[in-house]
Amino acid sequence: MSSVLPTPVLPTPGRNINRGHFPDDFIFGAGTSSYQIEGAAREGGRGPSIWDTFTHTHPELIQDGSNGDTAINSYNLYKEDIKIVKLMGLDAYRFSISWPRILPGGSINAGINQEGIKYYNNLIDELLANDIVPYVTLFHWDVPQALQDQYDGFLSDKIVDDFRDFAELCFWEFGDRVKNWITINEPQSYSDFFGVAYDTPPKAHALKASRLLVPTTVARPSKPVRVFASTADPGTTTADQVYKVGHNLLLAHAAAIQVYRDKFQNTQEGTFGMALVTQWMKPLNENNPADVEAASRAFDFKFGWFMQPLITGEYPKSMRQLLGPRLREFTPDQKKLLIGSYDYVGVNYYTATYVSSAQPPHDKKKAVFHTDGNFYTTDSKDGVLIGPLAGPAWLNIVPEGIYHVLHDIKENYEDPVIYITENGVYEVNDTAKTLSEARVDTTRLHYLQDHLSKVLEARHQGVRVQGYLVWSLMDNWELRAGYTSRFGLIHVDYYNNFARYPKDSAIWFRNAFHKRLRIHVNKARPQEDDGAFDTPRKRLRKY
């Protein structure tokens, strides 16, 4: 972890930041994911995913008991959503392809859903027709339920071949127009919170994932239900399963890159990365070497777990030392596929945490993932929060954290090209607010201004960050938080046909970062379509 940071070369503009402060080729955009926005769970030949099964089997584990059956109906409203992206003047739109929408049975042998292929072709063509660059994620956690039933999903090595085939199908169908691919979104999050069975006993602890706004206590089902993984081996701890899932995610990533480079690279000329989530791991006591080392270990277990194998073909040294044989080794052939299997690194950053040292558990049989790194995390020091909370849980607002994370990646992971693939903040869904009140999101506006200023500062100091994608374009179905948490630049009226309205942050982002503002720092805001976008009482779809 970096301790001494360089002095800024250029002053940063603070909250007056706009597109003119960045180079012309810097990418600005916003992102979504399939299960969180599409809906149409039973339309167009789509098969069920593990999320469909999980939300219908255990609605009590979703904060409001909801599911993504309709999400925000983007499957039927995608043209309207693309119109929003165009009105905002964004360069790029990140979305994910629903694996079970194009392969309902999970595998090629089970059949290709041509209606699903058609949907994504239409989406991509509509983006390009509006001069918007697609950034496409292959896996955003929606494993086909068929593969979960057949062999326990990412707990099985068998999924590597099925993911490779799914990826190859996407390259064949969409790669002539898609040049920016993200293989896997947040493999650490998936491994930790989603890749392991709910019905394994230690999972009751893992379900209390702060990132996902789950309740502090959960109820267990009366009967085991295979949703995320298997209980076939009750002697295997949840932590060991976590690392097995992570291992297979890495192998699936490498297999997808291999098939692209072997069959498509010469003609399609696309680029690849994984989107890796991390926090700024700040030592609780920066004068305590044990806390400094603990913060470094925490970064290894969060980010290095999936980044280091792409550089050296091995897991971070701290993980290998602490986990020993519990952490699988890569074969020589697997190492060859992993090393260099990226063109850029996607970074998802939301928040920061204090880290202090901890003693290892006495009973290794009771070890879980959150104790393996021998560190504690907390959001406060001496009763003072590391940053103000955005809402009731997990997201402390710490803009300087993104600056430190970018420097840590530059210094410790061979100075890669970086895209911020997610950065954003939520507000609680307050149903008592009027539409006009709900569109006032000053916290988000300041969050984006302050984080972009820190990204620019890191660029000034040589970090090769080349793009910034807000999470998210629109309010969506936010996983374990359901509809209780709003991340969008665009307000979605969940109770009125999912009508879309711009929040203050969307209007600011458009005025500051519209693609027509590439040349001059102080150029006036674009005037075209202002009334259509800024009018608060009109639905965007009317325009």
Curated annotation (Swiss-Prot):
Catalytic residues, chain numbering: 186 (proton donor), 422 (nucleophile)
EC code(s) of this entry: 3.2.1.-
Alphabetized UniProt keyword annotations: Alkaloid metabolism, Cytoplasm, Glycosidase, Hydrolase
Cell compartments where the protein resides: Cytoplasm, Cytosol
GO cellular component: cytosol
Primary location class: cytoplasm
Family annotation (PROSITE patterns): GLYCOSYL_HYDROL_F1_2 (PS00653)
Molecular function per GO: beta-glucosidase activity
Binding site for a beta-D-glucoside: 36, 140, 185-186, 350, 422, 471, 487
Nucleotidyltransferase is among the record's keywords: no
Site label Controls the gate shape and acceptance of substrates, positions: 394
Catalytic activity: deacetylipecoside + H2O = deacetylipecoside aglycone + D-glucose; deacetylisoipecoside + H2O = deacetylisoipecoside aglycone + D-glucose
GO BP: glucan catabolic process; isoquinoline alkaloid biosynthetic process
Pathway listed: Alkaloid biosynthesis
SUPFAM superfamilies given in the database record: (Trans)glycosidases (SSF51445)
Keyword Cytoplasm among UniProt keywords: yes
Functional note: Beta-glucosidase catalyzing deglucosylation on N-deacetylisoipecoside and N-deacetylipecoside.
The protein's name in its UniProt record: Ipecac alkaloid beta-glucosidase 3
Organism expressing this protein natively: Carapichea ipecacuanha
Gene this protein is translated from: GLU3
